[in-house]
Structure formats: C-alpha cells, structure tokens
C-alpha cells in the first residue's frame, strides 16, 4: 500500500526520515517488479516450470499434469514450506496459474484447475471449492521472498552495485 501521509515516528515513514538524514537513495518497485520479473522468476527458477504463458499483468499459466496430492507435495518442497493451506477442487491438475503475493482477487479471470497465490480468504476458498477450482495458498511473504535474489541477478547483468536487504516476515508459525 502506498503512503497516504508521513508520520516519521511510525513505520514505514520512520525509514524515510532515516534515509533522508543519511542521504540514502531508495528505489521502490514492488508491484511493477512483480509484474515484469518476480512471478516469472518464482515460476521458472524456483518452481521449475519452464513452459508458461503470461495471462494478464500478473498471472502466469502453466501445464502441470500431476495429481493434486503430487502437485501440493512438489510446491511445498520447492518453496521449502512445512505446512500449506489448500483447497482440493479436483483430483488431477492439468493446468495452474501463479500470482505471487496476494492475488486472490484475480481468481475467475482465467480457466485453470489450480491457482497458487497468498492471502486467500475463507469465502474465496469456499467459492473455489464449490466451483471445483483447487487453491494452493503459498503465503504472501513466502511467495515474494525471492525478490532480493532475483533483483541481485538482474542488477549483476548491468554491473550495478546495490545493497539489498531481505524482508522479515512478521508472522510466526508455531
């Protein structure tokens, strides 16, 4: 979400105050980077699906051809997740779509057997189940944690030096 006002005693505006004091430049490119780079990076480099097509601004569709259970196990393993929320809408996944971060509002914009994203709400899950659409909630943070890695690789191509810090997930899993 963009800043609506700046209160330098609260996050994230306090970071801006510190950067101004230290004469630090910041390029913030969350959404546009997701559109152009991150979704494709997670799909091809992290999950290993090389045959895909972009459908709209954020979503990448790809062929799976696996049972639902096999696909879930594969996704958990590749994203290094110990638990995962799923909605089993069908037994076999022929095609799937990915949107890193929070893409639940994009459900229904395309025809696939399974949709992977984060931040699915209860009623979205219920509607997907009733419409035989499988969901895999790969969590918002966990699906975007590859930002720094992918940005570093892109900057290296242009011989650009940058300090990239990793984000911290405020949630704890117990």
Where are these regions (language model features)?
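Active-site catalytic microenvironments in core metabolic enzymes, especially phosphate/sugar-handling
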Residues: 1-174
